[in-house]
Amino acid sequence: MSAPRDLLPQDILVPISVGELMDKITILEIKSERIKNPSQLKNVVHELEALRAIRLRDIERAMLDKLSAELKRVNAELWDVEDAIRDCEARSDFGEPFIALARTVYRLNDERSRLKKAINLASGSRIVEEKSYRSFST
């Protein structure tokens, strides 16, 4: 990966996995589509452009694009579920719909983790994030 040329002293560069980079980009894409506040949107677009400027070498683009699209779908679904949870919270409604939504969050996060790992393996990322949770039965 190459670094942007216009780095400032306050910019922090840290090594991350390719999956983490793609996750961050997909979340920023969702934010850029959904955030309406102009000053917030400006910050989101700035960060998104900075991350998109990072070039990934020797990666099978078709596979990465497919996995990234799946990751974006999961992140968008997580966004919607989190919004619905906040709506329940605002109404102090902690019944069955709230419980179902809360359970959906960890299932979606498991899928998100699986996709990030698949991106890491497909891209040959030197850093591979690992998650470890107790398994659950459906």
Task: Give residue spans per PLM region.
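Extended, charge-rich alpha-helical interface modules
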Residues: 2-138
